[in-house]
């Protein structure tokens, strides 16, 4: 486990994040990369329910206040850095990106952007002027799950039979998958079923069910510790588990490469990706699993460890890079991807150092107050953080207040439409009767206006022509 529980999951998150970034930045490379979201959902459901059950098992209860405060501290620091910085950059680079930005920011912060996007008709699969924070639908679904899952755990703990919670959570996952498949019609935009918290929650509930099943297995083995349970699982399934996980990984990668948008992904691939993710988790978390050793590959694990910040920053930065270098287009998509990845790494690291880590350790007060010993490094971090927050939020507020209501292209098209409408009205008012031209009279030319040129046929006809057309 390398000093941490479920350390192999960082590698899984790294694989999922790479797939998502490739899909967003260059769909031709990985047309099914959006399935990485379902890997994330399954891992998130597993981890959050495991954490809650571990706390309950230790006799500390759910800890409602601590639970919600911890989630708040984990999610919002990076958001409070991302939003003003990217909005300010968009103001200088391409103000068309700020159309509708006020509602986007509000719904992102409230954790309901996915429903706003559905109601406003924003399509996840559209490429023309997409929302700057369109990728935040994922975080909105996750935030809503975080809000509800402790309530679900509290209720399910009252069950008469200890396996009922597993069946209920699995049933919720199946209902979500069926709802997605039944609500989707081939001719429809899949955004409703893809963004919906009700239709795209199979991975979350399936991960939660697996976490609960693991807890029951622990209790069924004489209430052993998590470490002892993993040892026993590895002893019994040491060969089969990693092999099954490896096959699941290959199947998942194959789907990401070959299954794109459409009915197949909505009705089959998303549910399959969630199920395969459970197999991946099961085969990679036991101690001694060679699959875990594979997934702790350092670069992959590092990407997974900082996946939240990378996910937040990559999409708006990609839009900004496209706006700065429009001449690259699809032909040089690799250049756009390279610049985006570089900038994402820089901003994700700075966000972690200046915002996320201090708040996770000491709360939001850490953003404006250094640690106990005020040395030069702490002072520098303090003033850098205060300066960045003040400047970016001030200018972002100005940019939001003065954001355009529509894109430049839309404004130009509407202006042209109004001009054509005025021209039509003018033409109607100026319409006058035009005299009909006289019918032309065609007369037969006389012989002296003709010249006959030919061979023996013409020579044989010359007498008749001279009689009919005098002076030819």
Q: What are the roles of these predicted feature ranges?
A:
Residues 2-9, 15-398:
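Hydrophobic membrane-embedded alpha-helices
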Residues 362-451:
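N-terminal secretory targeting modules
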Residues 448-463:
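Catalytic nucleophile-elbow at a beta strand-turn-alpha helix junction centered on a G-D-S/GDSL motif
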Residues 465-468:
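Short Gly/aromatic-enriched secondary-structure transition segments
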Residues 470-472:
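Conserved small/polar residues in nucleotide/adenosyl-binding loops
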């Amino acid at each position: 486990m390398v000093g941490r529980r479920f350390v192999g999951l960082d590698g899984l998150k790294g694989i999922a994040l790479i797939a998502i970034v490739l899909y967003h930045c260059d769909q031709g490379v990985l047309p099914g990369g959006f399935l990485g979201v379902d890997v994330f959902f399954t891992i998130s459901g597993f981890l959050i329910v495991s954490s809650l059950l571990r706390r309950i098992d230790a006799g500390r209860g759910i800890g409602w206040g601590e639970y919600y405060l911890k989630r708040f501290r984990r999610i919002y620091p990076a958001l409070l850095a991302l939003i003003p910085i990217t909005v300010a950059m968009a103001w200088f680079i391409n103000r068309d990106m700020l159309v509708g930005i006020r509602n986007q920011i509000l719904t992102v912060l409230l954790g309901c952007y996915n429903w706003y996007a559905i109601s406003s008709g924003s399509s996840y699969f559209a490429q023309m002027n997409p929302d700057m924070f369109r990728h935040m639908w994922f975080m909105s679904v996750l935030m809503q799950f975080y809000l509800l899952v402790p309530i679900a755990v509290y209720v399910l703990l009252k069950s008469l039979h200890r396996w009922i919670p597993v069946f209920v959570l699995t049933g919720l996952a199946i209902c979500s998958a069926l709802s997605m498949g039944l609500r989707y019609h081939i001719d429809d935009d899949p955004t409703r079923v893809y963004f919906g918290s009700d239709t795209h929650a199979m991975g979350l509930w399936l991960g939660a069910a697996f976490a609960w099943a693991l807890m029951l297995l622990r209790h069924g083995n004489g209430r052993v510790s998590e470490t002892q349970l993993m040892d026993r699982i590895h002893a019994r399934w040491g060969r089969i588990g990693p092999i099954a996980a490896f096959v699941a990984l290959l199947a998942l990668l194959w789907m990401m490469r070959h299954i794109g948008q459409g009915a197949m992904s909505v009705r089959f691939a998303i549910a399959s990706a969630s199920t395969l993710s459970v197999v991946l988790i099961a085969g990679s978390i036991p101690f001694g699993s060679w699959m875990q050793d594979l997934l702790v590959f350092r670069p992959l694990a590092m990407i997974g460890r900082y996946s939240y910040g990378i996910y937040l920053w990559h999409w708006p930065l990609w839009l900004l890079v496209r706006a700065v270098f429009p001449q690259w287009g699809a032909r040089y998509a690799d250049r756009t991807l390279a610049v985006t990845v570089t900038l994402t790494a820089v901003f994700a690291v700075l966000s972690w150092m200046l915002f996320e880590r201090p708040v996770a350790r000491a709360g939001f007060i850490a953003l404006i107050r250094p640690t106990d010993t005020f040395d030069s490094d702490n002072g520098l971090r303090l003033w850098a953080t205060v300066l960045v927050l003040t400047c970016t939020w001030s200018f972002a507020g100005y940019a939001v207040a003065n954001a355009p209501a529509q894109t430049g292209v839309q404004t130009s098209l509407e202006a042209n439409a109004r001009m054509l409408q005025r021209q039509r009205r003018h033409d109607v008012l100026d319409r006058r009767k035009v005299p009909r031209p006289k019918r032309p009279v065609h007369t037969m030319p006389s012989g002296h206006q003709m010249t006959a040129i030919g061979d023996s046929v013409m020579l044989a006809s010359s007498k008749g022509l001279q009689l009919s057309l005098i002076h030819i």
